[in-house]
A protein has these predicted regions:
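N-terminal glycine-rich flavin-associated loop
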Residues: 46-77, 81, 99, 103-148, ...
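Flexible inter-domain linker/hinge segments
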Residues: 2-5, 203-248, 254, 524, ...
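Terminal amphipathic helices with adjacent charged low-complexity linkers/tails
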Residues: 274, 308-416, 454, 599-600, ...
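A glycine-rich phosphate-binding loop feature that marks nucleotide/adenosyl-phosphate handling sites
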Residues: 88-90, 148-155, 239-247, 314-331, ...
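C-terminal substrate-binding/cap subdomain adjacent to the FAD-binding core in PCMH-type
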Residues: 157-159, 167-170, 177-400, 511, ...
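N-terminal flexible segment immediately upstream of the FAD-binding catalytic core
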Residues: 1-72, 76, 86-118, 147, ...
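Ferredoxin-type iron-sulfur electron-transfer modules in oxidoreductases and energy-metabolism complexes
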Residues: 550-581, 585-723, 841-847, 885, ...
Length: 1018
């Protein structure tokens, strides 16, 4: 039995008083002080971990101003505040103690657009890709690019002055910020925009907080103008945080305070809104993927690409390429980056040309390609091949792979993981190759592996050395390498921070600014935040205050992780290896990962949040001397002793009375998971939440009773076959209002599905497929076996959507094969989802033995529901290991593709069909939609894939009363719009859950693709 974890770091009374008074004064946002909420805000995309005291989620600038006004009261003068956006920073920019002000949950509105003047006004929590999706119909985009664009907020981009691919032409975020609305500590609203210097000087004479700010910045930047120009490196990725260089324009006629705030990392004010310059979308885009025999060759050849007037040149090394090959993303780009015969590709330059004149762009591209052919023929520059991508869709897939590179590096095998700490250095592009040669020599001298990729056109290369931060010696080495890289970048006239901000690396600021200019930064900080209460420890302390800076060797995630025994870390890899990349925060409703995060906007309910909580739970168990691996081994095979039952009942009673246990907070996060498994493939680290969720639930319920519904769900495969013998009787009973009311109130289940009428057994009466014995199957000759298909049943389709199975049997017959309906054998997936892992292992072993016996017959076995079929491949393998055997159950599309291989494609005509894939299917098997389309094409039918996220049902998730609202909300995110837009009778869904959700919400259902094929053939 797991122990009660009754102690968690508390929240000081002053913070609680502040939050209470904040709500009393009309704060309309959310506040959070639970340990779970604070833990999710204690990490970002960096190696650091710092626990805040509380989190607030304002809904408006007025809410932020209220926070700032109350904070200025003397009684709260010791509290500190840190703004936070998407939490994608790689250097701990938004990590701090005190109160986190999260702008991402609610402040995500696009306020107005002026296409004629080319600007848009947004709130700070708007996500970069969200904005570009909005701008696309207007023919514009927000140009600064970054790899985390589908979850990074514009407020975060402004605060770090982010940039990425294309910056040589498009510049940094600060080049596109026309003005911001910021809230100062005290509640004053500061609106910035470029001003004539005379007006700025006049504003500086006002005896107000804003006046003092204008005066300080104006005077310091004017008086130290020459020193600033002399000391700021002449780089595309210029020195920011604080950008003294660009406050005045070159002619000294214009003053813009915006430049101080961009890159300020929340140390000066809360940026709540921004007016942004938007760029017309180029009409023509071409990508040339140039392949090299070494990474050094790719680096040294990059200037040649820039001279060819390319928009951007992105470089990827062999380590990243090889990791991409092992990821789901490679499926989308493999045809665009093919191997060169008899050559090893060790480097890749992704060269983009863009513009409005197609003839001019093609002329530049063709000239480059001719020159590349000459280099290949003469064996020069290490060029071994190239491929052009003329279509926008192909180019976007290439960039999606490149964007995923950061996360892919985190999936490297072994305890040492490539980590960020010196990953965005910038040097003059002409020195990049030599600089990287020295950088590599430095890492090689320590015997480290590393991955490299980046923006070689701008002289920025992302370098991530692999270190095990659970090893104290390697943690020390990280600081040593940081110091060496600082010296190396200085040697080449570069910067340590090319695009990701300073964060915990701000301790190196004096080395780059010089002591004299660093003193000027402190004066600016003092004008905005004299008492060092906004994100203290970052950028610089205010003048006149001897305050410490954050350090590169501050407390890290590894400091906490190393407290968990190595064996436990290895066995709970899914939770331990999350590196915080945050892809699970993807805003796009059509992306399968992560539905619970999308509907709640609560990061506890994301793979990253769940992994964070489980790591802490494992650490707290270790702190109490409890080994979860030993507990798992000691679990009884079956049954529970009376003593244990009494103890669980007592513990559950105390829990219901409000007795604290951190395990309850973890349980709450796990209960929100739909177990769709999208994270197990979509996440670059392959964080499989359903796997460690099941293990957690199993251990949690050693201490606490399970709800009745868990037992009912886990035994559905036992009672469904019995109920199906009299489906009308049971349906009548289930449909009674009293039964439904009792089910919702006492069991916690709603909208219970009805059994199929007629049942599958009734539909198959007299059909040969249901009446063949094992002996008859074994007696078939080779020719007969080649034409026989074994249909594997699952509990949901066979008993609740039996027509699908019956139609598949008929389809197999129509195609000239002999279908045989195998006896039903429980799959066990429901047991796995609910954490009945011992029972699941028994179920899996029994069914695996049966299917292995069938497999020896040498006939294909096929199932129609993706989630259940894929359970045989994934969960069975984890539970049984080698005892699983070699059996293989095919999905319907896999078998059809093989069976129809020799059949020619017919002329496609008529109305389209529309394919809605199951989350588990399309993420685990990304080629499934195309495979289904190819199958339909063989019969002259067109099948279009509909891009949607999760339907919200996910097995029994949508039937649980506590999930009902979220289940319907998830459906509304993407499925409902598609169903309203498309003809229902032409919509097809492979998942039983998906079809039942459509029927529940829309009133009428959709069919399985095999049913449409049967109709087409008829």
């Amino acid at each position: 039995m797991i122990p009660q974890i009754s102690q968690a770091p508390g929240v000081v009374q002053l913070v609680l008083n502040f939050l209470q008074e904040l709500e009393q004064q009309g704060f309309t946002g959310d506040t959070a002080t639970s340990y779970a909420d604070r833990l999710t805000m204690s990490t970002d995309n960096s190696i650091y971990q710092l626990l805040p005291d509380a989190v607030v989620f304002p809904r408006s600038t007025a809410d932020v101003a209220l926070i700032a006004r109350l904070a200025a009261q003397e009684r709260y003068s010791s509290l500190i505040f840190t703004p936070r956006g998407g939490g994608t920073g790689t250097n701990g920019q938004a990590l701090n103690q005190g109160i986190i002000v999260d702008m991402s949950r609610h402040m995500n509105r696009i306020i107005e657009i002026n296409p004629e003047e080319g600007w848009v006004r947004v709130e700070a929590g708007v996500i970069k890709d969200q904005l570009n999706q909005y701008l696309k119909p207007f023919g514009y985009f927000f140009a600064p690019e970054l790899s985390t664009s589908n979850r990074a907020t514009l407020g975060g981009m402004i605060n770090t002055d982010a940039s990425g691919q294309g910056s040589l032409v498009y510049g940094k975020t600060s080049d596109h910020v026309l003005g911001v609305r910021a809230v100062l500590l005290g509640g004053d609203i500061l609106d910035t925009q470029p001003l004539p210097v005379e007006l700025a000087e006049t504003l500086g004479k006002s005896n107000t907080t804003i006046g003092r700010i204008y005066n300080t910045v104006y005077q310091r930047c004017r008086q130290q103008r020459q020193l600033i120009i002399d000391n700021f490196p002449k780089l595309n990725r210029f020195l920011t945080g604080y950008d003294l260089r660009h406050v005045f324009n070159d002619e000294m006629t214009e003053f813009d305070l915006t430049r101080i705030l961009t890159g300020s990392e929340g140390t000066l004010a809360f940026i709540t809104e921004a007016r942004l310059d938007i760029t017309p979308l180029p009409k023509v885009r071409r990508l040339v993927n140039v392949k090299y025999d070494s990474f050094d060759s790719a680096l040294r050849n990059a200037p040649f690409m820039v001279e060819a007037r390319a928009l951007s040149v992105e470089t990827v090394d062999s380590k990243v390429l090889n990791l991409a090959r092992e990821d789901i993303v490679w499926h989308s780009v493999s045809e665009l980056i093919t191997d060169v015969p008899d050559k090893e590709m060790l480097g890749l330059n992704i060269v983009e040309f863009a513009g409005d004149d197609e003839a001019l762009i093609d002329e530049r591209v063709n000239a480059l390609c001719v020159r590349l052919d000459e280099l290949i023929a003469s064996h020069q520059a290490g060029v071994i091949g190239w491929q052009m991508c003329r279509e926008l869709a192909g180019g976007e897939r290439i960039y999606a792979m490149r964007k995923k590179a950061v996360g892919l590096l985190g999936n490297a095998k072994g305890a040492a993981k490539p980590i960020p700490f010196a990953e965005d250095t910038c040097v003059p592009p002409e020195h990049l190759a030599d600089y990287i040669a020295e950088f590599r020599a430095l890492l090689d001298s320590h015997g480290l592996s590393y991955g490299m990729f980046g923006h070689v056109d701008a002289g920025v290369l992302h370098v991530r050395p692999a270190l095990d931060m659970c090893d104290p010696q390697q943690e020390i080495l990280m600081k040593q390498i940081s110091d060496d890289v600082v010296a190396l970048t200085a040697k080449y006239g570069g910067l340590l921070w090319g695009e990701h901000g300073k964060g915990f690396r701000a301790e190196y600021s004096p080395a780059f600014f010089g002591e004299e200019l660093f003193a000027e930064l402190r004066k600016v900080k003092a004008a905005f935040d004299p008492h060092n209460r906004l994100n203290p420890g970052k950028i610089c302390p205010p003048e006149g205050l001897d305050a410490p800076m954050m350090k590169v060797d501050a407390v890290k995630r590894g400091t906490f992780n190393r407290q968990i025994p190595i064996a436990v870390r290895q066995q709970w890899r899914g939770a331990m290896e999350c590196n915080g990349n945050g892809l699970c925060f993807n805003f796009d409703a059509r992306s399968p990962m992560c539905p619970s995060m999308k509907i709640t906007q609560n990061r506890i309910h994301s793979p990253k949040g769940r992994a964070t909580l489980v790591r802490e739970w494992l650490r707290l168990l270790a702190d109490r001397g409890v080994d979860p691996l030993k507990l798992e081994q000691e679990l009884p095979e079956s049954g529970v002793s009376l003593r244990t039952l009494i103890a669980r009942t007592r513990n559950s009673w105390h829990a219901n009375k409000g007795e604290y246990d951190f395990s309850h907070e973890v349980k709450e996060a796990m209960s929100g998971c739909l177990a769709c498994k999208a994270c197990s493939t979509q996440c670059p680290i392959k964080i499989d939440v359903p796997e460690f969720r099941s293990r957690f639930l199993q251990l949690y319920h050693t201490r606490y009773l399970r709800p009745l519904r868990d037992h009912l769900v886990a035994t559905v495969e036992s009672y469904a076959p019995l109920m199906a013998r009299a489906p009308k009787t049971f349906n009548f009973f289930i449909n009674q209002p009293l039964v439904r009311k009792l089910s919702e109130k006492h069991i916690g289940m709603v909208d219970l599905p009805l059994l199929s009428v007629p049942s599958l057994q009734q539909q198959m009466v007299g059909h040969r497929s249901a009446n063949m014995t094992l002996e008859q199957l074994e007696a078939l000759n080779a020719e007969q076996k080649a034409r026989t298909v074994l249909v594997v049943q699952d509990p949901f389709t066979s008993y609740y959507d039996a027509q699908v199975v019956a139609d598949f049997v008929r389809l197999v017959e129509k195609l000239g094969f002999q279908p045989v309906l195998l006896p039903f054998s429980p799959n066990g997936k429901a047991q796995h989802i609910k954490g009945f892992l011992n029972r699941f292992a028994k179920t899996a072993k029994k069914t695996a033995d049966f299917l292995n016996r069938m497999a020896k017959l040498g006939m294909p076995m096929v199932g129609v529901d993706p989630a259940l079929v894929l359970c045989y491949r994934d969960e069975y393998k984890l539970a049984l290991g080698e005892e699983r055997g070699e059996f293989n159950v095919l999905l319907a599309n896999e078998w059809l593709a093989s069976a129809l291989e020799s059949q020619p494609v017919a002329t496609v005509s008529g109305e389209s069909w529309y394919f809605f894939g199951h989350c588990t299917e399309v993420t685990a098997l990304p080629g499934a939609p195309a495979q289904w389309a190819a199958i339909f094409a063989r019969f002259g039918a067109k099948l279009e894939n509909v891009s949607v996220g999760c339907c919200g049902m996910a097995g029994t998730y949508g039937h649980e009363a506590k999930n009902h609202e979220n289940s319907l909300g998830i459906y509304e995110l993407s499925w409902h719009q598609a169903m309203q837009r498309l003809p229902r009778n032409r919509c097809l869904a492979t998942g039983y859950s998906c079809r039942s959700q459509v029927k529940r919400v829309e009133g009428t259902g959709v069919r399985h693709p095999v049913q449409a094929l049967l109709e087409i053939i008829k």
